[in-house]
Amino acid sequence: MSLEILDQLEEKIKQAVETIQLLQLEVEELKEKNAESQRNIENLQTENEQLKNEHRNWQEHIRSLLGKFDNV
């Protein structure tokens, strides 16, 4: 009887170890996805800043042209 209980316990331990290993793999995948998402965020923030600067430059250029029209 106790041998049967030990066999059951061993099987449960094996299942628990397998579950832990699968969860560890899933955690690693999620960490990789998180890192990729973080890189994408940084790239988008950089692009956003560049576009804001470009927009500002165009606004200044248009103001300058409008100022020249006012002087004519």
Swiss-Prot record:
Keywords: Cell cycle, Cell division, Coiled coil, Cytoplasm, Septation. The keyword Cell division applies. Its main location: cytoplasm. Gene3D superfamilies: 1.20.5.340. This is Cell division protein ZapB. Residues 1-71 form a coiled coil. It comes from the Bacteria. GO terms for biological process: division septum assembly; FtsZ-dependent cytokinesis. Belongs to the ZapB family. The keyword Heme does not apply. Non-essential, abundant cell division factor that is required for proper Z-ring formation. It is recruited early to the divisome by direct interaction with FtsZ, stimulating Z-ring assembly and thereby promoting cell division earlier in the cell cycle. Its recruitment to the Z-ring requires functional FtsA or ZipA. GO terms for cellular component: cytoplasm. Homodimer. The ends of the coiled-coil dimer bind to each other, forming polymers. Interacts with FtsZ. It is found in: Cytoplasm.
